[in-house]
Structures are given as structure tokens and as C-alpha cells.
């Protein structure tokens, strides 16, 4: 099934192959790639097309959902808001990146709010988590703003560009999400 959502300022839709150039440009920025778990730098030619095809297949199977964040006012792709799903455990993990020119404008928070709504209300998830490198406060501020609670820090949990990085984890259960709606 194909999902598409609108927020005040954004259209969230599945990625299309025509997005590849913008994905490579935005995600390939060294400052964006530096604090993400899987984005390479430099971003190789052809990698965006491969990634888009991979996430489209996963989205169609319901294993994960990767939404292109598109500004409604000008149609510009500005980032990615994804949610990996564990159907057996009714659990999901939120992950995202935003192109540097669009940092600090509330787009990630707006998209994350809509995607966790989708996770809890449409997919029936019981728990949604997210993680960020401790050196990326902008990312975990988004988690706080959408109501997630800090659950702990895993020291030296990932190896990024030859350096072990700490990850801070945030989470929310459905009952807490529902309380926020009252």
C-alpha cells in the first residue's frame, strides 16, 4: 500500500527515482552524513537510486516506511523521515535526516509527529523508539518535542568514520501517545 500524508508545511510521500539527485546532494553533505548511522560521504553516484529502490520495496512490503519530506510551498525535497517496523513485536524505530539548508525550521518535528501518528494509529504499533549520536543534539531535541522520553545512552555503540560514537535512545509507548491527545 502507498501512503501519503500532509502536515501544515510538508507533503510526506514515498521516494521516487526522480528524487535521487536531491537525495545525493542533501544527504551527501558532510555535516548531514557525519551524524547519521548509514549515510556515506562522499555519497557515491548511483547510491541514491539504489537506496530509493530498496526503501520503496521495503515500504511496499510493510517492513519499513521511508517518506520524502517535501515542502508544500515550493515542492522541494528537504529530507527523509523513516520508520522501520517489527510486526511481531508491534514496535517501530524512527530515523530521519534533513538537508542542512533546512535545519532548525521545525520540519523534522512536524514530519516525526505525523509519522508516529501513522505508526500508532494506522499500523497499530505499541512502541516507537529513536536513537541519535550524542553529538547530534538537534536530532534528540526532535525526539523530546514529539513526546519521547530519554531511555538511556549506549557508550561507543556505533563505529562511524573510524570513531566509536555514543547513542542516546528515546522511546514512547502507545498509552503515553494517547495521553498526549487528550
In which residue ranges do the predicted regions lie?
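Short, conserved alpha-helical segments within structured domains
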Residues: 40-44, 65, 135
